[in-house]
C-alpha cells in the first residue's frame, strides 16, 4: 500500500490517541469511585471533628474567662468576662445539641455544663459585690486621708503661730535683760518654757499623729486585714484618741472646731476596716468557688475527651473504607499502564519506525553525503513513500544546479580578486590623506602653542611693567597712560584667549575644560557688571541688574566660563549701544537658569540674526571685535549643557539669553579671599630664562615680602638648590634653554621631594596638559598674571593664610621700623615683657574671683600695648575680653605666640641690616 508520510503519521497518532482515551476513561471511573467513597465519609466525619474541636475550644475559653472573672478589679472587666462566659455557654449548648442530633450521647456533658453555669453565675454575683465594696473602701479611705491631711495642716499652722509668739517672747527677754529688769525677764522665760514651747510641742505631736493615721489608712490592704486585723484596729483607735486629746489643747476656738469636725471623718476608720473584712470574706469564698470550678472543668474535659474518642473511632472506620477503594483504583491504573505501554511500543515499532523513521534516516544520510561534496552519490529506495520519491527527484535537480553554481563561483572569485586589489589601493590613499591631515593638525597646534607663548611672554612684560609703574607714586601724572597700556594689553590678551578657545572648540571641544563646582550666582553677576562699569564712564549709558528672588543662593556649574560668556555679552552690548541702558537679568524657568543681557543699542537685522553665532561674522565692521565672541559663548553654553539665543529689533535693541541647567548646590560655596596676601619670609626659586619676565616677577613677589632667587636654566637651578638654603617652592617655566621644564620638574621631585613645584608658563594650559602634569606640579600659574592674583595663587598652592590671619601687622611694623628704627621696637618689646605680661596673672586672679571690672581694666591696658606693637590678633582677643570679661577666651596663648613672632621678625630685620 503506497501511503504518504503524513497519512502514516496520522495513523500512528490516531492509535496513540485511542490508547490515551481508553486509559483516561478507565482512570476516570476509578477516581470517580474513590471520590464517591471519600465524599460519603468526609461529609459526616469532617463536621463532627470540627464540632468536637470547637467544643474543646469553647470549654477552654470558658475556663479562661472564669479565672479572669475572679481577678476582675473593675466593672468593665467584670461585665466583659460575664459576656464571654454567656457566649461560650451558649456555644457549648448549641454544639451539644448538634452532636446529639447526629446520634451521640451527650447527657453527662450537658449535666456537667449546667452545674458549671450555676457555679459561674454565683461567682459573677460575688465579684460584683466585691467591686461595690472596693469602691466604698476607696471613697471612705480618700475621705479619711484628706481629713488627716487637713488636721496636719491646721496643726502645722498652730505650731508656726506658737513658734512666732515664742520668738517674740524671746526677743522681749533680751530687752528686759538689757534694761536690768531681772524679775520680769525670769517671769517671761518661765512663760516661754511652760506655755509657748509646750504648745509648740503639742501641736507638732498633733500633726505627726494625723500624718501617722493618714499613712496607716493609705497602707491598708486586703492582705494586711487578713493577717492582722485586730492589731490594725487597735493602732488606729490609739492614734485617733491621741488626736482627740490634742484637739482639746488647741487655743484657737475656730481651729479647734475645724479639727473636731474633721475628726468625725477620721473616726470612720472602723467602717473602713469592716469593708475590708467583708472584702476578705468574699475573696475567700471566690477562691473556694474557683477551686470547685477547676474540678468541674476537669470532669467536663474528661467527658469531652470520651466524646472525641467516640468520634475518632467512627472516623477510623470511614478511613479504612476509603483506603480499600484507593487500593482498588491503584491496582486498576497499574494494570492499565502496563497494557498501554505494550500497545504503545507496538505502534511505535510498526507504524513510526518501519514506515517513517528508518526511511527518513537513510534519506538523511544520502543528503549528508551530498552536502559533504559527494554529488554523484546514489539515493536509497523510497519504500513506496511519495515524499521520499519527490526528494529524490529534487536532489537530481540539485546536482545540476550545483554544477552550474560551481562554474559561476569561479567567475565571481576572479571578480572579487580584482575588486580587492582596487580597495587596497583606496585604503593606502586614505591612510596617506589621514596622515597629512594629522600633520596639519599637529602643525596648527604647534603654531597656536608657539604663538601663545611668543605673545604671552612680551605681553607679561608689558602688563607687569605697567602695573609696577602704576604703583610708583612718582608717576601719578602718567597714570592714565599706564591705564591705557594696561587696557590695551588686557584687550590683546582677551583676543588671544578667544582665538585659543575657538581653536579648541573647532578641534571638537576636547580641550575645552568645564568645571563643576558650587558658586553663588548673585555675587558672580554683580561683580561681572561691576567690572564693566569702568567702560561706561563719560558715556550716556546706565548699567542695571534685575535678579529675581527665585534664583537660588548657590548653584553648581563653571563660574569662570559663565563669567566669560556674560562678559562677552556685556562687551558686545557696550560696543553696539551709544546711549540708553544695559540690563543684566537673572531668573529661573522650570528646570533652567536664565541670564539675559538686554541693551537699547542699534539692534540686529533679522536676516543676519541666524548668522551671528557663526565664526568671524560681524554685524558691523565699524564697531570692532574679532567676530569670535558669540561663537565661543554659544559653544561654551553647549559645553555646559545649555544654549545661547538672541532676539533683536533694529533701532530698538537686542536681548541675548543664556539658558543653563538649574542645579542647586548642596555643598557650601568656598569663600575666596580678595585681600592682599603677604609672603613675608617665604623663600622662592624662580626658574625662568626670559630676563624681563624674571625682573617683573621678582619685583612683584618682593613687594609681597617674599625672598626670590631667579635662575635662567635647569643646570643653575640644580646647583642653587644644592648649595643654598632650602626653598619653600620653585616656579618652573616650561621652556628652558637646556632642559624641558617638565623634565626638570621630574628630576626635582625625585631629588627634593619636600620642595613644592609650581608651573609658570605662557603656553596654552588645557585639560590635557593639566592631567599630564598633575602629579608633578601643585598647580600651574599662566602668564601673564596680575600681582594680586600671583600672590593669591602662591598662597593657595602653598596653603598659606591670608594677611588677616597672621599674628602681626607687618605693614605697621615696617612703618615703625622706618620711622624710629628696630632698636626702638626692641625697647618697646622689653617694656611690654616687663610691665604688660604681669597683667595676665592679674586677669587669672580676677577671673577666679569673678571680678569683671578688674578684668576690663587689665584687658584694656593689654589691648593698647598689643596694638602699639602690631600684635593684631592678640589685640582683637583683648578687645573681646574687655567686652565679655567673664565669658570671652583668654588671650594668654595668642600673646605668647605674638611675642615669639615679633622676636623672630626683629631678629630677621637685624640680620638683614648686617
Swiss-Prot record:
Quick one: where is this thing mainly located? membrane
> Which InterPro entries does the annotation name?
CheY-like_superfamily, HAMP_dom, HATPase_C_sf, His_kinase_dom, HisK_dim/P_dom, HisK_dim/P_sf, HPT_dom_sf, Sensor_TorS
Q: Tell me what PTMs the record reports for this protein.
A: Activation requires a sequential transfer of a phosphate group from a His in the primary transmitter domain, to an Asp in the receiver domain and to a His in the secondary transmitter domain.
Q: What molecular function terms (GO) are annotated for this protein?
A: ATP binding; phosphorelay sensor kinase activity
State its location(s). Answer: Cell inner membrane
Domain Response regulatory, first and last residues per copy: 683-798
* Activation/inhibition comment: Inhibited by TorC apocytochrome.
Q: Which residues form the HPt domain?
A: 821-914
Domain of life of the native organism: Bacteria
Keywords recorded for this protein, A-Z: ATP-binding, Cell inner membrane, Cell membrane, Kinase, Membrane, Nucleotide-binding, Phosphoprotein, Transferase, Transmembrane, Transmembrane helix, Two-component regulatory system
Reaction catalysis annotation: ATP + protein L-histidine = ADP + protein N-phospho-L-histidine
Q: What topology in the membrane does the UniProt record assign?
A: Multi-pass membrane protein
Give TM regions: 9-29, 333-353
Chain ranges on the Periplasmic side, renumbered to this chain: 30-332
Its EC number is 2.7.13.3
HAMP domain segment(s):
354-410
GO CC terms: plasma membrane
Chain positions with Phosphohistidine modification: 453, 860
Domain Histidine kinase, chain residue ranges per copy: 450-664
Q: Which PANTHER family match?
A: HYBRID SIGNAL TRANSDUCTION HISTIDINE KINASE J, SENSORY HISTIDINE PROTEIN KINASE
Spell out the protein name for this chain.
Sensor protein TorS
Annotated source species: Escherichia coli O157:H7
What lineage is on file? Bacteria, Pseudomonadati, Pseudomonadota, Gammaproteobacteria, Enterobacterales
Amino acid at each position: 500500500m503506497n501511503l504518504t508520510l503524513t497519512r502514516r503519521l496520522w495513523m500512528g497518532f490516531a492509535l496513540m490517541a485511542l490508547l490515551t482515551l481508553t486509559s483516561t476513561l478507565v482512570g476516570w471511573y476509578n477516581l470517580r469511585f474513590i471520590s464517591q467513597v471519600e465524599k460519603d465519609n468526609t461529609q459526616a466525619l469532617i463536621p463532627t471533628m470540627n464540632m468536637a474541636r470547637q467544643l474543646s475550644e469553647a470549654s477552654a475559653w470558658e475556663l479562661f474567662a472564669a479565672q479572669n472573672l475572679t481577678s476582675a478589679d473593675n466593672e468593665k472587666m467584670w461585665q466583659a468576662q460575664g459576656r464571654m462566659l454567656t457566649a461560650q455557654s451558649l456555644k457549648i449548648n448549641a454544639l451539644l445539641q448538634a452532636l446529639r442530633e447526629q446520634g451521640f450521647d451527650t447527657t453527662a456533658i450537658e449535666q456537667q455544663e449546667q452545674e458549671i453555669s450555676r457555679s459561674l453565675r454565683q461567682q459573677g454575683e460575688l465579684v460584683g459585690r466585691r467591686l461595690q465594696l472596693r469602691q466604698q473602701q476607696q471613697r471612705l479611705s480618700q475621705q479619711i486621708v484628706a481629713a488627716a491631711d487637713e488636721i496636719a495642716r491646721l496643726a502645722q499652722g498652730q505650731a508656726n503661730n506658737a513658734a512666732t509668739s515664742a520668738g517674740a517672747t524671746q526677743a522681749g527677754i533680751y530687752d528686759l535683760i538689757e534694761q536690768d529688769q531681772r524679775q520680769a525677764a525670769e517671769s517671761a522665760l518661765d512663760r516661754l518654757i511652760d506655755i509657748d514651747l509646750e504648745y509648740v510641742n503639742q501641736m507638732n505631736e498633733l500633726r505627726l499623729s494625723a500624718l501617722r493615721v493618714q499613712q496607716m489608712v493609705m497602707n491598708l490592704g486586703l492582705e494586711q486585714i487578713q493577717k492582722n486585723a485586730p492589731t490594725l484596729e487597735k493602732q488606729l483607735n490609739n492614734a485617733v484618741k491621741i488626736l482627740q486629746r490634742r484637739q482639746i489643747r488647741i487655743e484657737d476656738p475656730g481651729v479647734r472646731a475645724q479639727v473636731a469636725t474633721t475628726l468625725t471623718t477620721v473616726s470612720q476608720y472602723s467602717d473602713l476596716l469592716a469593708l475590708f473584712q467583708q472584702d476578705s470574706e468574699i475573696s475567700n469564698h471566690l477562691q473556694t468557688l474557683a477551686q470547685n470550678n477547676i474540678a468541674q472543668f476537669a470532669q467536663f474535659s474528661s467527658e469531652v475527651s470520651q466524646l472525641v474518642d467516640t468520634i475518632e473511632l467512627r472516623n477510623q472506620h470511614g478511613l479504612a473504607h476509603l483506603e480499600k477503594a484507593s487500593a482498588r483504583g491503584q491496582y486498576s491504573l497499574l494494570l492499565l499502564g502496563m497494557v498501554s505501554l505494550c500497545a504503545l511500543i507496538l505502534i511505535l515499532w510498526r507504524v513510526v519506525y518501519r514506515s517513517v523513521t528508518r526511511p527518513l534516516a537513510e534519506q538523511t544520510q544520502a543528503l549528508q553525503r551530498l552536502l559533504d561534496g559527494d554529488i554523484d552519490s546514489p539515493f536509497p529506495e523510497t519504500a513506496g513513500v511519495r515524499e521520499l520519491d519527490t526528494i529524490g527527484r529534487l536532489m537530481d535537480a540539485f546536482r545540476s544546479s550545483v554544477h552550474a553554481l560551481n562554474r559561476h563561483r569561479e567567475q565571481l572569485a576572479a571578480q572579487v580578486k580584482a575588486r580587492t586589489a582596487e580597495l587596497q589601493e583606496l585604503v593606502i590613499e586614505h591612510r596617506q590623506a589621514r596622515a597629512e591631515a594629522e600633520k596639519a593638525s599637529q602643525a596648527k597646534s604647534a603654531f597656536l602653542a608657539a604663538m601663545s607663548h611668543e605673545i604671552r611672554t612680551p605681553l607679561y612684560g608689558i602688563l607687569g611693567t605697567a602695573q609696577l609703574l602704576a604703583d610708583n607714586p612718582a608717576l601719578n601724572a602718567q597714570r592714565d597712560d599706564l591705564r591705557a597700556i594696561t587696557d590695551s594689553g588686557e584687550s590683546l590678551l582677551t583676543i588671544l584667549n578667544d582665538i585659543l578657545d575657538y581653536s579648541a572648540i573647532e578641534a571638537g571641544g576636547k580641550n575645552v575644560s568645564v568645571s563643576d563646582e558650587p558658586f553663588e550666582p548673585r555675587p558672580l553677576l554683580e561683580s561681572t557688571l561691576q567690572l564693566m562699569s569702568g567702560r561706561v564712564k563719560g558715556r550716556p549709558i546706565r548699567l542695571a541688574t534685575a535678579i529675581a528672588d527665585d534664583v537660588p543662593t548657590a548653584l553648581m556649574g563653571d563660574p569662570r566660563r559663565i563669567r566669560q560668556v556674560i562678559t562677552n555679552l556685556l562687551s558686545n552690548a557696550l560696543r553696539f549701544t551709544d546711549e540708553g541702558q544695559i540690563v543684566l537679568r537673572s531668573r529661573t524657568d522650570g528646570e533652567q537658569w536664565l541670564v539675559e543681557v538686554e541693551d537699547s543699542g542699534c539692534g540686529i537685522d533679522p536676516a543676519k540674526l541666524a548668522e551671528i553665532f557663526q565664526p568671524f561674522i560681524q554685524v558691523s565692521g565699524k564697531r570692532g571685535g574679532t567676530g569670535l565672541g558669540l561663537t565661543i559663548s554659544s559653544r561654551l553654553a553647549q559645553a555646559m549643557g545649555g544654549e545661547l539665543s538672541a532676539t533683536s529689533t533694529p533701532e530698538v535693541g537686542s536681548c541675548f539669553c543664556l539658558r543653563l541647567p538649574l542645579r542647586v548646590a548642596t555643598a557650601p560655596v568656598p569663600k575666596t579671599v580678595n585681600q592682599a596676601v603677604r609672603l613675608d619670609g617665604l623663600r622662592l626659586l624662580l626658574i625662568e630664562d626670559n630676563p624681563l619676565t624674571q625682573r617683573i616677577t621678582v619685583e612683584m613677589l618682593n613687594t609681597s615680602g617674599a625672598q626670590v632667587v631667579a635662575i635662567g636654566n635647569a643646570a643653575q637651578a640644580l646647583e642653587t638648590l644644592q648649595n643654598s638654603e632650602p626653598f619653600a617652592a620653585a616656579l618652573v617655566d616650561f621652556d628652558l634653554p637646556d632642559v624641558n621644564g617638565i623634565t626638570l620638574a621630574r628630576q626635582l621631585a625625585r631629588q627634593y621631594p619636600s620642595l613644592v613645584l609650581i608651573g609658570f608658563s605662557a603656553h596654552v594650559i588645557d585639560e590635557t596638559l593639566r592631567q599630564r602634569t598633575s602629579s608633578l606640579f601643585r598647580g600651574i600659574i599662566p602668564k601673564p598674571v596680575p600681582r594680586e592674583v600671583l600672590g593669591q595663587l602662591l598662597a593657595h598652592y602653598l596653603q598659606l593664610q591670608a594677611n588677616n590671619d597672621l599674628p602681626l601687622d607687618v605693614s605697621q611694623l615696617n612703618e615703625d621700623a622706618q620711622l624710629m628704627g628696630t632698636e626702638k621696637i626692641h625697647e618697646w618689646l622689653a617694656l611690654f615683657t616687663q610691665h604688660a605680661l604681669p597683667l595676665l596673672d592679674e586677669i587669672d586672679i580676677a577671673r577666679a574671683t569673678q571680678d569683671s571690672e578688674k578684668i576690663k581694666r587689665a584687658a584694656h591696658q593689654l589691648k593698647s600695648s598689643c596694638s602699639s606693637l602690631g600684635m593684631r590678633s592678640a589685640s582683637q582677643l583683648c578687645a573681646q575680653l574687655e567686652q565679655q570679661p567673664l565669658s570671652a577666651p583668654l588671650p594668654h596663648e595668642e600673646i605668647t605666640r605674638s611675642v615669639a613672632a615679633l622676636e623672630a621678625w626683629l631678629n630677621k630685620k637685624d640680620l638683614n641690616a648686617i
